[in-house]
Amino acid sequence: MVKRTGHFELPPEIYHAPQIRVIRRAGIDIPILCNSIYSAEREALRGDVDNIVFSIEQEGRSREQAFGDICHLIDDDYVASLSRAVGELPHFFDALGVHLEIRKNVDLYVRTICFWIAGFQQWQTETVCYRSESNISPDKPNCIESLFA
């Protein structure tokens, strides 16, 4: 999506580079993990089961412990790996002799992924979908369903 909306391509040797894979994976997994925390209460009320919080609870952890485990995973693994990968890019570029135009595209790609993570996080903290007053009966439409009604 980033490449399409930015109207550029990354060369395969850049797109598949370990650092870019780490950055891309963070852009996918961090929002999913955060969503698991924010949506757990609503999904529990509805009887949904596809949430990592519930999987962790099945291992004998409390809900609060599951939240903490996920937060630690995000901070200690994903954010740390993302920061490390971004920090490695200049050396990686120098070693490959990457041209300035490609470096600019990679910078845009990385910044867009980071903005996506931040924007999704902000939306999750502000949307009414995750507020307790929006946790309505499982037999009635909720936030997502109301978008399609």
Tell where the protein language model's regions lie, with residue ranges.
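Alpha-helical, largely C-terminal catalytic domains
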Residues: 1-149
